[in-house]
Amino acid sequence: MRLENSELRAFRAVIEEGGFKRAAEALHISQSAVSQAVAGLEFKLEAPLVQRGKDLRLTEVGKRLFEHAVDV
């Protein structure tokens, strides 16, 4: 399993920017591309990374991945 740097950057931006729309704006890519990147990571890791809803929250797996993604 290979986690792509672009996927990790998108995931990190979602957390740092507080949502998918703002992450897309910060990365100058579509919101769909950000969603697909995070979904790709979730598929590869076989676990959800964020709890979607009114507030965006990291899951335990998401917290561990975010620590790694900060280095990318």
State what each model feature region is.
Residues 1:
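C-terminal effector-binding regulatory domain of bacterial HTH transcription factors
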Residues 4-7, 31, 62, 69:
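The N-cap/first-turn positions of alpha helices
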Residues 10-14, 65:
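Short alpha-helical "packing" element that flanks the helix-turn-helix/winged-helix DNA-binding module
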Residues 13-28:
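Short helix-boundary/capping micro-motifs
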Residues 37:
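Residues in the recognition helix of alpha-helical DNA-binding motifs
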Residues 42-58:
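A short LG(V/I)-centered, amphipathic sequence patch enriched
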Residues 44-45, 65-72:
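Alpha-helical linker/hinge and terminal dimerization helices associated
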